[in-house]
Amino acid sequence: MKRFISAWNRTSLIKRIAIGVVIGAILGLLIPKITVIGLLGDMFVGGLKAIAPLLVSALVANALSQTREGQQSNMKTIIVLYLFGTFAAALTAVISHYIFPISLKLGAASATKAAAPQGVGEVFKDLMLKMVDNPINALSQANYIGVLVWSVVFGFAMRTASEHTKELLHTLAEVTSQIVRWIINLAPFGILGLVFDTISKNGVGVLADYGVLILVLVGTMTFVALVINPIIAFVMMGKNPFPLVFRCLKDSGITAFFTRSSAANIPVNLQLCEDLGLNPDTYSVSIPLGSTINMAGAAVTINVLTLAAVTTLGIEVDFATAFILSVVSTISACGASGIAGGSLLLVPVACSLFGISNDLAMQVVGVGFIVGVIQDSCETALNSSTDVLFTAVAEKSRWKKS
């Protein structure tokens, strides 16, 4: 038994999740009436639901508190590129939704249609009210918009705090991330339960829906990596960006694909920046910062899953509302890619814009974890490779002007 446990712990999380998916599907076909197996999925989603608001608060506040006033102009350019690139990716995901609308198989609760907001005006009003919610109430009631806003406020306020105070905030973020890592390590069992529950209730045909979801997610991220990012790079540099784009994807993206963590890929990116001959004073700051706030892949994941949930519930979304969704997903993604699967835990933030309950939003998160073996790897590859790309683009743009 000890040998089995040791071998299990040595196996990568990706392989363990894949094993959970296979076993869950087999059990769902063979013994669909043993519903207690689905309890594993309910407990896993419950754990995520419990820690998600605190995770958003801690990571966002910590990330913003670490930014320094008076950064050199090149650093400001990189930050603008990070944020604009993330927003462009979010908008690309919205457009892909209109071209390839997809729906999900959710639980029985989805049979009751969510109250659809009456256009952008109602969405904006609801957004404003959620922003000024009591911060403690926002955490306890999983009001992610309120959590996000207060985290941003506290994060900026903490920029002028003492280093000791910032260290406490950083420690809180680390502790919260560690708890999330413990929960994520239980993902194979939770996903086994989720897949079992899905297959036993909906049959094998539901797997085709997941296949379409994976194609839309990966296709959108590929479009961002090979079309959107090169366009941004060309505008900044004024020359062919593809040699640099492919170098970043090859040397950074491939490694990030397997680590599934932008934070874990920081040493690889720092070495790549050195190989590219970039300014160490710049990339020593921009790469760690990018692993926290440069979230193109996360923005794609959040928007695709949110809009899939919206389609499933029959909610009509105009483009103005979808544009607000892109802004919200860009901001809320701050801090997500430092941990494996972090972007999925931010889907409820975006879902709350459309009046989707936290229970339904967490079902969507569960679907995200089922496809996460591929989604999270591709997302991290896009996020991490873009850190180096935009750092290099900003510096080469300065060289062009000098």
From Swiss-Prot:
Gene3D superfamilies assigned to the protein according to its UniProt record, in alphabetical order: Sodium:dicarboxylate symporter (1.10.3860.10)
Entry keyword tRNA processing: no
Lineage summary: Bacteria, Bacillati, Bacillota, Bacilli, Lactobacillales
GO molecular function, one term: neutral L-amino acid:sodium symporter activity
Main location: membrane
GO terms for cellular component: plasma membrane
Homology family: Belongs to the dicarboxylate/amino acid:cation symporter (DAACS) (TC 2.A.23) family.
Positions of transmembrane segments: 17-37, 44-64, 78-98, 138-158, 179-199, 212-232, 295-315, 336-356
Membrane topology qualifier: Multi-pass membrane protein
Full protein name: Serine/threonine transporter SstT
Subcellular location: Cell membrane
Biological processes, Gene Ontology terms: serine transport; threonine transport
Catalytic activity annotation: L-serine(in) + Na(+)(in) = L-serine(out) + Na(+)(out); L-threonine(in) + Na(+)(in) = L-threonine(out) + Na(+)(out)
One Pfam family linked to the record: SDF
UniProt keywords, alphabetically: Amino-acid transport, Cell membrane, Membrane, Symport, Transmembrane, Transmembrane helix, Transport
Function noted in UniProt: Involved in the import of serine and threonine into the cell, with the concomitant import of sodium (symport system).
